Amino acid sequence: MLLLPSAAEGQGTAITHALTSASAVCQVEPVGRWFEAFVKRRNRNASTSFQELEDKKELSEESEDEELQLEEFPMLKTLDPKDWKNQDHYAVLGLGHVRYKATQRQIKAAHKTMVLKHHPDKRKAAGEPIKEGDNDYFTCITKAYEMLSDPVKRRAFNSVDPTFDNSVPSKSEAKENFFQVFSPVFERNSRWSNKKNVPKLGDMNSSFEDVDAFYSFWYNFDSWREFSYLDEEEKEKAECRDERKWIEKQNRATRAQRKKEEMNRIRTLVDNAYSCDPRIKKFKEEGKAKKEAEKRAKAEARRKEQEAKEKQRQAELEAVRLAKEKEEEEVRQQALLAKKEKEIQKKAIKKERQKLRNSCKNWNHFSDNEADRVKMMEEVEKLCDRLELASLQCLNEILASSTREVGKAALEKQIEEVNELMRKEKEEADARMRQASKNAEKSTGGSGSGSKNWSEDDLQLLIKAVNLFPAGTNSRWEVIANYMNIHSSSGVKRTAKDVIGKAKSLQKLDPHQKDDINKKAFDKFKKEHGVAPQADSAAPSERFEGPCIDSIPWTTEEQKLLEQALKTYPVNTPERWEKIAEAVPGRTKKDCMRRYKELVEMVKAKKAAQEQVLNASRARK
């Protein structure tokens, strides 16, 4: 069963009562306005409410058509039908005040009104003169309707609407009243857009997103405006196909040129607006301020990061310093402990040595003869120098707990062992010296008598001269040879070649041979200066390393500090050497004076040797 909606206002609904007779089968075809509305909704896939809106829209258009008042075109009767293309079609139909906003219904109604008023038959009946054929001005009305009733032709005419203002405001015009100048311009140019919902220019309170969307739209403006209406040649008038193609080509080129000019006009409009827009300036200033703020924030972050890194570095340095101080303190404590142990050992060995001397003295050195006692005293001193603490303690225990004969036997046995050890050491040293001499003779090739018979004094003098004249001295080896010839007590004259050969042979010596040379030099020094061995002057395991004035050699840094102090405090300075000693940490006044004297002697020796070399070279010339 088909259910129809209720009737609208002003319409009635007829109710048919059911008959009591039997029902019969019949065919019914749907008709009427309700069925028409149903078919429209089904074809458009729309609801009832949509159809109601469509009906209301049609009713509103009809009411607007009824309210539309046509404007009489005063120049209508003077128009030339042959020049219909240059006429204003909207004005001819009385729609000059509506123009492109006029609907097709309005155009049709306006044409109907103009036909009823200006048709030649009606005017002829009224007694007005009529021109024959297409020469009558009514032809202009017909042409106007033909152009405006066709959507394609109407768009072509709208594109070149003679009343449209194509002007573009200059920058100077919009400096003070930007929105008042540019808002109507963009409003009227928005009619050419293919896209609907054209964004508005807005005002000073518009957001950045709205302004950016506005200029993005207009910089990418998609215009439907075309200029086919201005074609100078009509292809319909062509006599052949080639002529028609040529006309089409000319028209396309002209349209493209005008389209390009139109897009340039739009671009100029947008550029002028963008350059004058106060919002753009405001946004740029805000962006600049934002960047400056971000820059300051980054700089502050970098500064804090740098401070954190510096703080961490200082903490690490402090930790390293504390660790180093702790390590140095541990080393110092160990050194102090070792020193204490060494002092204890020195005291113990000193005590044992004194005990050994007293024990031997109590036994009258185990001899009644004066010469034997002196010899025994020397042997006892030798034992004190050579024996270690354990051996001394063992020997003292024997002497304290035994008789004279047993003590003498133990003492003599210990003396024999020490003498045997010294004899072996001397033999080994002599063997090394002989081997060193042979190697030196081989290295020098046995040249000259000057390369032989190097005494211990000459060797020590050579070592001293090599240290005195370092590498880089002019004619170094000649200077060293002259220095040795002046200061040597052997009387042997040495040449530069002899000195070089011996220096090379000394460099090849092993450490034991160097120790032997130093030991012999020190033994000779003791004999010459009468230095008696002291019981507490050396540790049990110490060996003689040769004569040394300072216990600690001077470092390069100490030498620089001494030289600077000598320059800072001249000779006339009161308490000069005390101040110099204060400027050199770790050195006493005596150390500084002794080092100064050594430097003076070295400088004098260098000058003397160099003068001799210079004099010898002059004599040879």
UniProtKB/Swiss-Prot annotation:
One MF term in the entry's GO annotations: Hsp70 protein binding
Localization (cell): Nucleus; Cytoplasm, Cytosol
Domain named J: residues: 88-161
An annotated GO BP: DNA replication
UniProt PTM comment: Phosphorylated in M (mitotic) phase.
Domain SANT, chain residue ranges per copy: 449-511, 549-604
Entry-linked Pfam families: DnaJ, Myb_DNA-binding, RAC_head, ZUO1-like_ZHD
Assembly and interaction partners: Component of ribosome-associated complex (RAC), a heterodimer composed of Hsp70/DnaK-type chaperone HSPA14 and Hsp40/DnaJ-type chaperone DNAJC2. Interacts (via ZRF1-UBD region) with ID1.
Functional note: Acts both as a chaperone in the cytosol and as a chromatin regulator in the nucleus. When cytosolic, acts as a molecular chaperone: component of the ribosome-associated complex (RAC), a complex involved in folding or maintaining nascent polypeptides in a folding-competent state. In the RAC complex, stimulates the ATPase activity of the ribosome-associated pool of Hsp70-type chaperones HSPA14 that bind to the nascent polypeptide chain.
Entry protein name: DnaJ homolog subfamily C member 2
Organism: Rattus norvegicus (Rat)
Gene: Dnajc2
